[in-house]
Curated annotation (Swiss-Prot):
It comes from Solibacter usitatus (strain Ellin6076). Binds 3 Zn(2+) ions. Zn(2+) 3 binds at H182, D229, H231. Belongs to the AP endonuclease 2 family. The keyword Zinc applies. Its EC number is 3.1.21.2. Pfam families: AP_endonuc_2. Zn(2+) 2 binds at E143, D179, H216, E261. Keywords: DNA damage, DNA repair, Endonuclease, Hydrolase, Metal-binding, Nuclease, Zinc. This is Probable endonuclease 4. The gene is nfo.
């Protein structure tokens, strides 16, 4: 199992990798540019080389990039849609240039339209954004959401429909990223042992766990079914340490990368959360039933 954390570039790709390595992470996630700006510069080739060297030094793999917060490929608003397609193409190009293994994207909001229209809009947007890309090893990961309002991704079936339709329109590899906080907020029981078994059975049946390449490890400030996406420190939210122990030690998940996106309220919070995650993953308690 590879455990890691979201780190920030602070103007330097190398900084993000060095931070992850210094924290003792085995994998990490970054934004390839500002998460709140439509346009971004192409990464500096020198910085890419330094990033690769830092990754090799600390054996950091995989590298996951999270798409910026503005991209909404499910939108049918012509202005937002055009900006989203252009911005996501930039995300793809930067991820390929940097050498990332995965690019995580939220399915987006279909406000004013139907779920089916939103799914179709996302798939078509991904097709347009990825047209003509050079050969690469990048896989795009659809992240589950808290399922609030008109946001896609709160149900496994929606993620599956997006992937299936996208596969008909493009050769771009598509998988999934599951966020523990989002799962709980969307109504999945991942807290109890029977609930976790049921959730994983559903994920296997609908998504195929082999297609779930990354997990985001976040506790939740709100209870199950709240549809509110607010991350908490590991063990301090409504998921709790015991549930994370079951998740991290489950036989079907032990080879998955888990990446923290927990709050930083005080200096040292990143290290503390990562150390807690490592401790829970290394627990000697009996493994749950398959």
């Amino acid at each position: 199992m590879r455990l890691g954390i979201h780190t920030f570039t602070s103007g330097s790709l190398e900084t993000a990798a060095l931070t992850a390595g210094d924290l003792g992470a085995a994998t990490f996630q970054i934004f390839s540019a500002s998460p709140r700006m439509w346009r971004a510069r192409v990464p500096d080739p020198v910085q890419i080389k330094l990033l690769c060297a830092a990754r090799e030094r600390f054996s950091l793999s995989p590298l996951v990039i999270h798409t910026n917060y503005l991209v909404n490929l499910a939108s049918l608003d012509p202005v937002i849609r055009a900006k989203s397609i252009d911005a996501f193409r930039g995300e793809l190009q930067r991820a390929i240039a940097i050498g990332a293994e995965y690019l995580v994207v939220h399915p987006g909001s279909y406000r004013g339209h139907t779920v089916e229209e939103g799914i179709a809009a996302f798939a078509l947007g991904l097709r347009d954004a990825s047209a003509g890309l050079p050969p690469h090893q990048l896989t795009v990961l659809l992240e589950n959401t808290a399922g609030a309002g008109c946001h896609l991704g709160g149900k496994f079936e929606e993620l599956r429909s997006i992937r299936d339709l996208t596969a008909e329109l493009t050769d771009l590899p598509i998988g999934y990223c599951l966020d523990t906080c989002h799962l709980l907020a969307a109504g999945f029981d991942i807290v109890t042992a029977p609930g976790l078994r049921a959730t994983l059975r559903a994920a296997e049946a609908v998504l195929g766990l082999a297609n779930v390449h990354v997990f985001h490890a976040n506790d939740s400030r709100f209870p199950r079914g709240s549809h509110v996406d607010r991350h908490a420190h590991i063990g301090e939210g409504f998921i709790g340490a015991d549930a994370f122990r079951r998740i991290l030690t489950h036989p079907k998940l032990r080879r998955k990368p888990f990446i923290l996106e927990t709050p930083v309220d005080e200096p040292g919070d990143d290290r503390r959360n990562l150390d807690i995650l490592k401790s829970l993953a290394g627990s000697k308690l009996p493994l749950p039933a398959r």
